[in-house]
């Protein structure tokens, strides 16, 4: 008996070449979509792109899939199987078993339409296990699974999936850009070969997805190493220095153009502190999705970066940060120095891990002795933080005549992450991410008086081993010697008999009697 040939299924985008369209049996493919309506439209055209006798099943998580799935009268199979499932982690793990109870999965094409943001509360470890399980299941039963995932943060989802190439045969995103759509292919593997890092413009007409005419003949760039994409503020008013330079008015436009780059130099501009987190997210997306050949530079045009912010940007994938006080000539020399570099540092797949580096201590001010020790121990154990750069531990002993509780009232830290405690007649401070050479400046900001007038002795620890060793000694202090702040004095606020006339406050006159009735009768 002649063996049957395994079918090859197709993604529902017309004019797309087979290397980016075919989905043979025995694999899992994943497409993120910015909008729910785009996801449904892509599913409908994907069904219409199959042969007449193809076995197709659609699994929906939200509502009745029969209300949104439409069969094309002239294309695709005459009938398909429809299933619903709960939008939960347990439902995902039981999916293979449930399908086996209903159909023989051999040579079937399963399309899973996820609910909006289904994967937000599912950990990356659980996602990895599920993909590994589905990969083995599709290979064993000679079937294919296409996951269509509508989500409002496709960049984050794509970054999490970039490392799943052993379980995923294809990963792409369908991005909505106002008047057009962009099909962003991270990687796609089938019987035609492997394609990666391609971006194609799509047109949607009459619910049909087609490749834009300009993309049908466009050649994907293979070597753009000489290109420099820069914010216009980086050159400080100077024109582009050569034909390789392209200037952009804002970081958003620069980021969108950099999505297609492979080895170019990308130069962002930073002028305000509130730009740091959005810029970090853009850098993380580019580094995770476009690879290690991309050179990413941040030019600080106005002083706005702290040491923790620099670590965040570098940890997200930036090659270099140019300080605000570097002249233009020095800036251009530094840009030239990154040419030909390959980014070699590890970038975590989830940016929230990196964002937690900026404020690992969500504490400020006085903490009980045990809470203080636990907080510093947690920080010392954080492997993502730089070695010997987590902060400074300072123990201060007050001069004779001043109690340590009184000295505590003068300690007024302003930064989150700066904490203190008292015990054993010492005031102990931990200044997160403070460099030891900046300690005196930091103490002058924290205390209103010179520290030499308040304290007679000071001990400092700034290396991780030193701080950890001192923590061991601090934990040996008995609770009876732990200090507590002085109680706040209760002062009754005087009641002011006044009213506001719309411009200023005016006191209300109160009538006073100089003599009471008894005194008047006596006279």
UniProtKB/Swiss-Prot annotation:
NCBIfam families: cellulose_bcsE, PRK15045.1. It comes from Salmonella typhimurium (strain LT2 / SGSC1412 / ATCC 700720). Keywords: Cellulose biosynthesis, Hydrolase, Nucleotide-binding, Protease. Disruption phenotype: Mutants lack the ability to produce a biofilm. Pfam families: CBP_BcsE (PF10995). The keyword Hydrolase applies. InterPro entries: BcsE (IPR017745). The keyword Cell inner membrane does not apply. GO terms for molecular function: cyclic-di-GMP binding; peptidase activity. Belongs to the BcsE family. Required for cellulose biosynthesis. May have protease activity, but BcsA is not targeted. Binds bis-(3'-5') cyclic diguanylic acid (c-di-GMP). GO terms for biological process: cellulose biosynthetic process; proteolysis. This is Cyclic di-GMP binding protein BcsE.
């Amino acid at each position: 008996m002649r063996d049957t040939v395994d079918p090859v299924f197709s993604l529902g985008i017309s004019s797309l070449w087979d290397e980016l369209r075919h989905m043979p049996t025995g694999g899992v493919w994943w497409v993120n979509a910015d909008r729910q309506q785009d996801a449904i439209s892509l599913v409908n055209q994907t069904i219409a792109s199959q042969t007449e006798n193809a076995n197709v099943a659609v699994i929906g998580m939200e509502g009745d899939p029969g209300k949104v799935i439409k069969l094309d009268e002239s294309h695709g199979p005459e009938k398909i199987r429809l299933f619903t499932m709960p939008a939960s982690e347990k439902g995902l793990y039981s999916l293979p078993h449930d399908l086996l109870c209903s159909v023989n999965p051999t040579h079937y094409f399963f399309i899973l339409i996820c609910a909006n943001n289904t994967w937000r509360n599912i950990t990356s470890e659980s996602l990895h296990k599920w993909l590994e399980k589905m990969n083995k299941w599709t290979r064993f039963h000679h079937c294919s699974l296409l996951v269509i995932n509508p989500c409002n943060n496709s960049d984050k989802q794509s970054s999490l999936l970039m490392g799943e190439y052993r379980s995923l045969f294809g990963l792409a995103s369908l991005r909505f850009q106002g008047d057009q759509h962009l099909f962003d292919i991270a990687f796609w593997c089938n019987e035609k070969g492997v394609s990666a890092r391609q971006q194609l413009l799509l047109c949607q007409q009459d619910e049909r997805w087609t490749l834009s005419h300009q993309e049908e003949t466009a050649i994907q760039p293979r070597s753009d190493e000489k290109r420099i994409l820069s914010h216009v503020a980086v050159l400080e008013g100077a024109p582009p220095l050569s034909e390789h330079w392209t200037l952009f008015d804002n970081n958003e436009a620069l980021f969108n153009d950099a999505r297609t780059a492979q080895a170019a130099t990308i130069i962002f501009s930073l002028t305000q502190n509130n730009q740091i987190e959005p810029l970090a997210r853009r850098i993380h997306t580019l580094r995770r999705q476009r690879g290690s050949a991309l050179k990413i530079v941040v030019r600080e045009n106005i002083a706005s970066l702290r040491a923790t912010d620099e670590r965040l940007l570098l940890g997200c994938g930036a090659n270099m940060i140019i300080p605000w006080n570097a002249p233009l000539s020095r800036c251009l020399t530094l840009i030239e120095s990154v040419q030909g570099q390959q980014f070699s540092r590890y970038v975590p797949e989830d940016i929230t891990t990196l964002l937690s580096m900026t404020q690992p201590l969500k504490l400020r001010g006085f903490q009980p002795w045990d809470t203080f020790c636990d907080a510093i121990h947690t920080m010392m154990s954080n492997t993502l933080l730089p070695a010997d750069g987590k902060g400074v531990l300072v123990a201060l002993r007050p001069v004779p005549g001043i109690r340590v509780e009184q000295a505590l009232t003068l300690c007024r830290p302003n930064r989150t992450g700066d904490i203190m405690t008292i015990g054993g007649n010492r005031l102990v401070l931990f200044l997160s991410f403070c460099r030891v050479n900046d300690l005196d400046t930091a103490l002058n900001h924290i205390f209103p008086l010179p520290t030499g007038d308040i304290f007679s002795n000071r001990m400092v620890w700034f290396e991780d081993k030193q701080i950890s060793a001192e923590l061991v000694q601090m934990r040996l202090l008995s609770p009876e010697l732990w200090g507590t702040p002085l109680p706040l004095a209760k002062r009754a606020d005087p009641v002011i008999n006044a009213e506001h006339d719309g411009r200023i406050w005016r006191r209300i006159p109160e009538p006073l009697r100089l003599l009471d009735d008894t005194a008047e009768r006596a006279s």
